[in-house]
C-alpha cells in the first residue's frame, strides 16, 4: 500500500536485518495464483494496521486456514471476533502465545472460518442483503 520509496526502503532494510530469511517483500504485482501460493507458504499473517486495510488479504488468509494477528484497535478485529471467526488474534499478545500450537490449531479451524465468513461474504449473503434492502 502506498508508493513511498524512502519509507519502503527503510522498512525493507530494517526487516532484512531483524527478520533475515523470514522476510520476503512483495515489490511487484503477483497474479492471483502466485499470491495464493505465497499465503499458503506462510505460518502466520500479521497485519499491523491501525485502520481498516488489507481486508481482502485478511479474508483470503483466513480462508486458507492461516492465523491472522491484528491490532485490537483495528476495526476489522472486533468485527471478525463478533462474527465468530476463529483464528483472529491480538497482536499485542503474540509474545505470550505458542505460535506452533496456534498454527496447528488454525489449520483444523479452517472450515469454521469459511462457514463464519460465508454467513456475511457469499453470493447468498449478498442476495439476502439486497432483497432486504429493496423491501
Q: What does each of the following model-derived ranges do?
A:
Residues 36, 56-64, 77:
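Short alpha-helical segment that forms part of, or immediately flanks, the ligand-binding pocket
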Residues 51-55:
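Short glycine/acidic-rich beta->alpha loop that forms part of the nucleotide-sugar donor binding site
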Amino acid at each position: 500500500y502506498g508508493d513511498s520509496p524512502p519509507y519502503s526502503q527503510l522498512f525493507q532494510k530494517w526487516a532484512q536485518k531483524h527478520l533475515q530469511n523470514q522476510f520476503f517483500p512483495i515489490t511487484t504485482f503477483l497474479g492471483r495464483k502466485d499470491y495464493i501460493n505465497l499465503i499458503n507458504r506462510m505460518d502466520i499473517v500479521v497485519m499491523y494496521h491501525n485502520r481498516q486495510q488489507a481486508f481482502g488479504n485478511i479474508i483470503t488468509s483466513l480462508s486458507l486456514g492461516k492465523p491472522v494477528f491484528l491490532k485490537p484497535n483495528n476495526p476489522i478485529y472486533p468485527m471478525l471476533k463478533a462474527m465468530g471467526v476463529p483464528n483472529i488474534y491480538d497482536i499485542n499478545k503474540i509474545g505470550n502465545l505458542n505460535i506452533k500450537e496456534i498454527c496447528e490449531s488454525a489449520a483444523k479451524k479452517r472450515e469454521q472460518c469459511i462457514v463464519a465468513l460465508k454467513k456475511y461474504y457469499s453470493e447468498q449473503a449478498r442476495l439476502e442483503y439486497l432483497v432486504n434492502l429493496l423491501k
